[in-house]
Structure formats: C-alpha cells, structure tokens
Amino acid sequence: MSQRTQWLRLSTRVLPALIFLSQFFTSTALGAQGDKLTKRVERAAEVLTELVSVPDKAPPSALLSEATCVAVVPGVVQVGLGFGGRAGYGLASCRTGTGWSLPTFVGLKGGSFGLQIGGQSADVVLVFVNKDAGRLASSTFNLGGGASVAAGPLGRNVSAETDYRLKSEIYSYSKSKGLFAGVDVSGTKWELDYSANRKAYPKADDMPRGDDAKSVTALLSTDGAKAPEIFRPFLQSLVKNIGEGTVK
C-alpha cells in the first residue's frame, strides 16, 4: 500500500473526529458564555428586589418614578490594591414612551463603590434622572466628569419636592455588607459591553444588536417587549420594583 493511500485512509478517519471535537468545544464555550450572561441578568434582577426590600433603606419612591434609566452592576470586585483596581459588569435599560427599553450590557471600572481593601464585592445601582440619559448611557464616560453623580438619598417617603433632582444627573447606591447605602462613585468609568450584547442579541433586521455606540442608542430607545428571553427577569424586575417604563 502506497504512502499516499495510507495517508488518505488515515485522514478520512481522523478529520471527522477533529471536526467533531472542534464543534464540541466551540459549542461548550458558547454555552458557558451564555450561562454567564444569564446569571448576570438574573442577579441584576435580584439586586433590584433587594434595593427596595427595606422601605427605610430604599431609594425614595419619588426618585424612582422620575428615573429615566436604571443600571445594575452586581458583584463589583476589587482586582487590585490601587485606585482603578475595581471592575464589574451588569446591564441597563431606559424608559421609553411605552415601557422599559431593550437592555444593554455595561461595565464599571475604577471608583470605590464603598469597597474596602481585601477583595470584597459590592452590588451597584445607578439611577439616571436626566432627560438625555439614553444618549448618555449609550456612550463611554466618567461618572462625575461626563455626567454629575451623587450618593443616592434613602427613605421611600422622601417628598417629591426634595431638591435632589436639581443637584445631579445620576444617583448611585452600593451594597457591600447587608443593606444598600448611597455612595459617591465619582471617577468611575462607564463602558458598554459590546461583546456581551453580540452574544445576547440575534442577527435580525428588526432589532439592533448593541455592538457599537449607535446600535446601543437604538437599543435604549426601543421598547423591550420583544427582547430576547435572557432579559425577561431583569425587565420584569424593573416593572415590579422601579415602576412602569412609560414616560410621564
């Protein structure tokens, strides 16, 4: 038997096995990535419930009713000892004329979030109240630089006449030990997670994918009624805990 014939026979046996292994590991990796995003969404939904679970330690109802966008970043962790060594990933949605928008995945880097040195994690919630929040949220900027940010007030019964709305565009909350508290996150960098958006949104002519700034702007201005199933827990939690997504 010639060397060529032997090689051809071997290749017909080995090549299918290599193709199978390649497909197996690719699908396994994609599945793991999908599970990771699902857990991120589910945890963000839980954080919103925890945010309002203790009335005396929850954001004022008046503030939540005025929210134009809400971002939740669970499990921000300290990844280094210096400033800027903290990072976390979550998602955001904005109020539209008819409901909460298609969400976008986002990330926060730097800042303090109320964390202490030692690897502690914190859940962070940002409440946007400026009317142009959708445009702002679809860009990369520094909190406190590109947009004013302040520690959020607490107490569900704070009057709607309170002047908090005149002082800042974004109000921030962090929970690192038990209850939420208002925390100043000035200096934190807001980023868009295009890679996660590409994994979550299908290629479809009638839906943006959030894989660039323009597309994220489209996400945050499009009603989330047709959002992929992965986002359902988060959108339902927004309605239940923050309020309807319609604009007043």
Protein language model annotation of sequence segments:
Residues T26-A32:
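Signal peptide processing junction and immediate N-terminal pro/mature segment
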